Amino acid sequence: MRLIVVSGQSGAGKSVALRVLEDLGYYCVDNLPVSLLTAFIQSVQGSQQNVAVSIDIRNLPKEPSLVQDVLDQLKQNNDVSMLFLDASKETLLKRYSETRRIHPLSLSQSKPSLAQAIELEKQLLGPLKEQADLLLDSSNQSLHELSETVRMRIEGRERKDLVMVFQSFGFKYGLPTDADYVFDVRFLPNPHWEPDLRPLTGLDAPIKSFLEGHSEVMELKQQIQKFFEYWLPMLEKNNRSYLTIAIGCTGGKHRSVYLTQQLGEYFAQLGHQVQIRHTSLEKQQS
């Protein structure tokens, strides 16, 4: 039997992840006390159905090491993994403002502000985050995008396929927190300084023509392709379920978007499971 523990910050998308897992055939339980987890797993052992359980700030034991002890015990007879959903403080503040929901820690006796509650929860969940097998940052993702990301990561893990996530970003918005590899392409020729090209993105044909007219752009693309072609077999043997490759330029609009799209399409054509995201572009268009 397979058990996925879903954890993460309040407002980061745990309920979305549980709905996706339910659609994938998992028996999902929200807010189950950790002390009851072993007994619950034993009770459903005979059904042969995969199970997903959420552990978060609502049911976190006072002693964080208890979670690891319980999971270590369950791993002896089950395939156990943890999915942790995270999001930036700014994203969480915006989501709570839009939904007008109350943060779980805001109900405590100290009655912290929303910003304080988010920061405190981050500290309390730190040990769980360190144990995560799958770490997803839902910042700047819509419900549909997050659902698709969770589905691809879970399905890829079940098939033992490595999911390659190609992600463009702008350095002025900050580094992505979930990247395994980061390529800084700010040294490449910048279409931003061409007035006719400035409003366009790396997905538009004139930007492609501009960048493909520079040999250094094509050489860098080929070198990144060769790097991952060479090392992918080793990464796949390392029991990884996904690999996040982030490519950044200044604003995340032209150079990084072009290279991310090209690399993602290249590896998809080779038969790999690929997901392409343009995080800063999505932020600019929202």
From Swiss-Prot:
Coiled-coil annotated residue ranges, if any: none
Entry binding sites for GTP: 56-59
Keyword check for GTP-binding: yes
Binding site for ATP: 8-15
GO molecular function, one term: ATP binding
Keywords carried by this UniProt record: ATP-binding, GTP-binding, Nucleotide-binding
UniProt-listed Pfam families: PapZ_C, RapZ-like_N
InterPro entries found in the cross-reference section: P-loop_NTPase, RapZ-like, RapZ-like_N, RapZ_C
Summary of the function given for this chain in its UniProt record: Displays ATPase and GTPase activities.
PANTHER family for the chain: RNASE ADAPTER PROTEIN RAPZ
Family membership: Belongs to the RapZ-like family.
Official protein name in the record: Nucleotide-binding protein VC0395_A2112/VC395_2645
